[in-house]
């Protein structure tokens, strides 16, 4: 799997197809494999880029000082778009990735041509109140993993 070094740390990503760029943004506690049934169907006409974002199921720890808040992850996605030198991107966000994609579109609109939101968090319900304790715990765990560079993952 290709990797790219960004100011926040190293991000793994998959890339398939050629054509106008589409970047897929997954939600919390999943990784880019969420899009495995989607991207092969689009790859004939589109360049599909699927990063593994630091939202709980990534395999490479971020730098200890990386901002892993939603706004920080949105900056990371913006930095990824810049590093890949893509413009007029179709940004597709699911779940928490939809909320992050909205932030990317606001802050990096010069690179985003279209925004597709699928079953996602948005507006005043991000994160949903029931998930606030889990999200705060997950961010704390991610920080600990980054500091020790050991995310405590097993297998795969």
Question: How should these model regions be labeled?
Answer:
Residues 1-10:
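N-terminal cap/lid segment of alpha/beta-hydrolase-fold proteins
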Residues 7, 16, 49-94:
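Active-site loop/oxyanion-hole signature of alpha/beta-hydrolase fold enzymes
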Residues 9, 21, 45-47, 85-90, ...:
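Structural signature of beta-strand start/N-cap positions in the alpha/beta core
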Residues 34-36, 59-66, 126-129:
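Conserved catalytic-core motifs of eukaryotic protein kinase domains, centered on the activation segment
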Residues 93, 97, 101:
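Gly/Ala-rich beta-loop-alpha elbow adjacent to hydrolase catalytic centers
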Residues 102, 106, 112-144:
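Flexible "cap/lid" loop of the alpha/beta hydrolase fold
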Residues 126-129, 146-156:
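Conserved alpha/beta-hydrolase catalytic His-Asp/Glu region
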